Amino acid sequence: MKIRIWLIAAILLLAGTAGFVAGRYFSDNRKPNFSEENVLYVYPEMTVDQVKDSLAAGACVLRPRSIDRTFKKMEVASKIKPGRYIIEPSATSIYVARMLVFGWQTPQNLTLSGTIRSKGSIARKISSQMMVDSTSIDAALNDTAFLAQYGFTPENVFALFLPDTYQMYWTASVKDIFDRFKKEYDIFWNADRLAKAEALKLTPMQVSVMASIVNGETLKSFEYPIIAGVYLNRYKKGMKLQADPTVAFCFDYTLDRILKKHLTVDSPYNTYKYKGLPPAPINVPNKGCIDGVLNPDKHGYIYFCASPEFDGTHRFAVGYNEHLKNAREFQRALTARNKAKAAGK
């Protein structure tokens, strides 16, 4: 009788133990352990406890002990990989542990957009979205030897960057990032665009320089090919381009208004003083501006000025007298607007 009782007790104990082990296995390996999606950023200096805290705060861990067990089992503390990880609500504890140990990252969107007129702006935009710091990016942008491997210099490196959204891993190194931009540059400059540049008797770099001037003149994309046509007309005629954005560049974009006295600044970038194109882009031109130069409107316009409607558009003219008429109309509108503003104070 006693033997039977002990046997039953042993069976129950084994069954209980098996159930306990199976329960833990199910909890750690099969059962989702997060209540919502979370983006987890793991920095190189982070400890496993900091990662756990970040998980708990962002993904709302349902069973913290399951995380503790699986992290210990997978030796996450010593094997964790920096990265950007997407934690889905359906993720199990063991999956997240493996994700961190094997570095199963989700690519990050890196977006370059808006007006980019300095290397510092490039560095800040990249570092704000990636793990690399702005100092490292800025150093690369000014490193002659580093840029030479991509065919660029610290002076013309603006041309390398084509504003868009690209996917890459958050932990990408400086070289990884520049490799990607060079790859995208080579893809963009396909046979068709190269042929169009050649037809204009311009190199891809010269096209980018011209595009940067267009980019500095207007925010209206429909005007890109029109303004490009104006500057190409001047260029072909051997005229000075007389582009205000190049003067702004000479003063590091610190001028509120470009006055007559600023037009005499002695710089190879000053197109009021020197004929031809500046030696390098004056900003990072977007793809639309580049294509605007490659596909310019065919017209006879030589001049243009801001519209008196103050809507960001321009009025164009073939002759100088027509241009003066447009300029005077704009000046009258500007004076009237300034008076109205002053009266309203």
Which residue ranges define each predicted feature?
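Generic structural signal for short, solvent-exposed loop/turn connectors between secondary structure elements
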Residues: 1-3, 105-106, 114, 254
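Intrinsic structural disorder
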Residues: 1-9, 37, 41-44, 53-59, ...
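Short low-complexity stretches enriched in small and charged residues
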Residues: 6-9, 37-42, 78-80, 119-121, ...
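Signal peptide-directed extracytoplasmic domains
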Residues: 23-188
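N-terminal type II signal-anchor transmembrane helix
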Residues: 1-36
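N-terminal start-of-chain detector that recognizes signal peptides
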Residues: 10-15, 58-59, 82-84, 136-141, ...
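Bacterial extracytoplasmic/cell-wall-associated proteins, especially those involved in peptidoglycan
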Residues: 47, 128-135, 147-345
